[in-house]
Structure formats: C-alpha cells, structure tokens
Amino acid sequence: MEKNVTCDSMTRNDKGWEVQFNYDTYVFDLDGTLLSTLGDLAASCNHALRANGMPERTIDEVRRFVGNGVKKLMERAIPGGLDNPLFEKTFADFRQHYMHHNLDTTCPYPGVMEMLESLRSRGKKVAVVSNKFYAATQAL
C-alpha cells in the first residue's frame, strides 16, 4: 500500500485519515460534536423531573430527546410536554440545575482540544454555534 493516498480533501497515512481542509474559519456545533454533554443534560433533566414528581428518564431516552435545544429536550422528557401545567416550573428547575452542574461530567471528545489548538496555531478562526441557552454555553 502507498504511504500517502489522497482523496479530495483527505489524506490517508500510517495514522489513518487526516482531513486536509484549508479554510480561514471553522464553525463547530457544541453539544455532541465538540463536547460530550449527555451525562450532565440527563442529570439535570432527571433532577427537574424528580423535583416535580415526574418519572425520570434513562440516558438512552435523553439521548433520543436531545436536538433542537434544551427547551425541546424538556418538552420531550416531560409527560404531556408543553401542555403539562408544570412544564414551565420543571423547565426552570432544569435550567437552574444545569447552570450549576453543566461541567460535572461534560468533557471534550478525544482529539478535540488538539484539533482546535492545531487550527489556532495555523492562524485559523474558530467559532462555536449552539442552540443551548447563552449562559450555559459560556462556562463550557
């Protein structure tokens, strides 16, 4: 096998495939792309559900509920969703808990920090987008 094989913007070498993009700016999603946040989201979700007398959700259920922001997560997790009379209180409890516990188990995926540092060291601009509420993204 050849030492280096290229395919569009990827190179395969002894270490595996390496992406060889050359953009000025790179934009990444936060949850589930750069950071593994599922554990803290599930813990805060279950804290809020428990505090309001609702059944807790498994990690797999929360994984399926994630997407389109934390309000949508809680809409899916709370029995009856937005129609539940305790929705707003439960959602507020979730937000309050998450603000204090969003770094309990959250961590970057393997290789993320090295990739970001590599981009920065090459003078590239890096941005993060998230549909998570602003205050929660700042600590992360």
Label each residue range with its predicted role.
Residues 48-49, 69-83, 140:
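Helix-loop "lid/cap" segments that line or gate small-molecule binding pockets
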Residues 75-114, 122:
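Metal-dependent phosphoesterase signature
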